[in-house]
Regions:
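N-terminal secretory signal peptides and thylakoid transit peptides that target proteins
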Residues: 1-20
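Low-complexity, intrinsically disordered regions enriched in charged/polar residues
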Residues: 30-38, 147, 317-319
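A surface/extracellular/periplasmic glyco- and lipid-processing/surface-interacting theme
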Residues: 67-124, 131-406
Length: 406
């Protein structure tokens, strides 16, 4: 008899959640590759090997799919809801979201990308493991004009791309995995792979990044950085627009127009959160009640100890208003994938949301690459995030037993 594991249970419940998403189910709003890969896309999402007819300038996520404006928008005394899609604050610009792949390796002194630059300015920081159990970041910004120097850069992976696809975000990276290339081709998605040797490093399309060893004896692949100016140049050279008419938000945020907050009344306290991506890649957060931020630290295999996660540009430790830890089935892509990780988004899974020093347990779902990432409470309502920066972890189900908070 086959053993029924926790992952099996989650996959079954996740498939049910995904079917609800595909059938158009929307909970009530709250106040706050190769033949195999293309065939899998065709069977699962109705996508074949030919490119999608949608272009980079496709319509923004519709209100039924993405996080809608809060219910208060029906109040005629309030101005129209026009929130920043990543933070829920009043909209700062009409710029296109930009996601930059950032190196997070810390195995030895030579194989060490930390401390990174520019990640403290990201509105959304996504962390998930890639090959060899090493975690990687996607630093997501509301506008290319808001990006300082950032890096070290790293290659693209489809688990990050799929989170950005519904938002038509500019995905900026140097190199990419074979599955990532397949997703880009099948969905006709315009990203900026500056490692595309047949395109960049040419007179028409110069290499839009720079090298800086920072006076350290680190491997060459950990020395590449970019900046908002270089990203704008790359986009202009490639004919990619950097303006976008977003009408919804990445998560559901408390309404900035009324000053609403999710105070997590009655929720269990959670001042310290410990996340394990693999044996050597662990992330912890400690809640600061004075500024209501979760301060980030990571284990450094190179130094054999936990260290504050700081932005080298400012020297400041990273802090987030919201933390979202989501568990998913993660495994090597089949065949000779070189250990590239496949995240099972379709099945959904468990989610743990942290804000204001408390925790809320729920579920997440993402029915297809083109569907936004959604997070639900036990009663089926969409979880309400507080306005501000968010850290999102996509964690292997197998590490659930090592996850804890108190």
């Amino acid at each position: 008899m086959k053993k029924i594991t926790r992952r099996t249970v989650l996959r079954v419940s996740g498939l049910a959640a995904a079917s609800l998403g595909l059938s158009g189910y929307a909970p009530a709003s709250s106040a706050c590759v190769g033949n195999g890969f293309s065939g899998w896309l065709q069977q699962t999402f109705g996508k074949g090997s030919s490119a999608s007819s949608e272009s980079t300038e496709a319509a923004a996520p519709d209100a039924g799919a993405a996080s809608e404006a809060p219910a208060e928008s029906a109040d005629s005394s309030l101005p129209a809801y026009n929130a920043d899609p990543l933070t829920g604050e009043p909209r700062r610009s009409s710029g296109r979201i930009v996601g930059v792949m950032v190196n997070n390796i810390s195995n030895t002194q030579r194989q060490n990308a930390r401390p990174q630059r520019g990640i403290g300015s990201a509105d959304l920081l996504i962390e998930s493991k890639v090959e060899g159990g090493i975690s990687r970041f996607c630093a997501v910004y509301y506008d290319a004009n808001a990006i300082p120097e950032v890096g070290p850069l790293r290659s693209g992976r489809d688990q990050f791309l799929q989170l950005l696809m519904p938002w038509q975000a500019l995905y900026y990276h140097d190199g990419e995995s074979a599955p990532c290339t397949k997703f880009i081709n099948v969905y006709n998605y315009s990203g900026l792979n500056i490692g595309g040797k047949s395109y960049f490093d040419t007179p028409t399309h110069p290499h839009v990044a720079h090298r800086d060893s920072r006076g350290r004896n680190v491997a060459y692949e950990h020395t590449e950085f970019t900046s908002g100016a270089e990203i704008r140049q790359a986009a202009a050279n490639a004919g990619i627009g950097l303006q976008y008419p977003y009408e919804s938000t990445f998560f559901r945020f408390a309404d900035y127009r009324t000053g609403a907050e999710n105070k997590m009344s009655g929720a269990a306290a959670a001042k310290t959160i410990n996340i394990v991506h693999s044996d050597s890649y662990k992330t912890t957060f400690s809640y600061n009640r004075w500024d209501h931020l979760y301060k980030m630290s990571m284990y450094s295999r190179a130094d054999g100890a936990f260290e504050n996660t700081v932005d080298e540009l400012t020297g400041k430790q990273l802090g987030f208003t919201n933390l979202l830890v989501c568990f998913a089935g993660i495994a090597d892509y089949p065949g000779d994938s070189g250990g590239v990780q496949q995240v099972d988004y379709v099945s959904g899974g468990e989610a743990y949301f942290f804000t204001r020093g408390a925790v809320q347990h729920g579920t997440w779902q993402k029915a297809s690459p083109e569907h936004p990432f959604k997070v639900y409470a036990a009663d089926g309502s969409e979880i309400c995030f507080n306005r501000g920066k968010t850290y999102l972890a996509i964690v292997d189900d197998d590490e659930w037993q090592n996850f804890n908070y108190q």
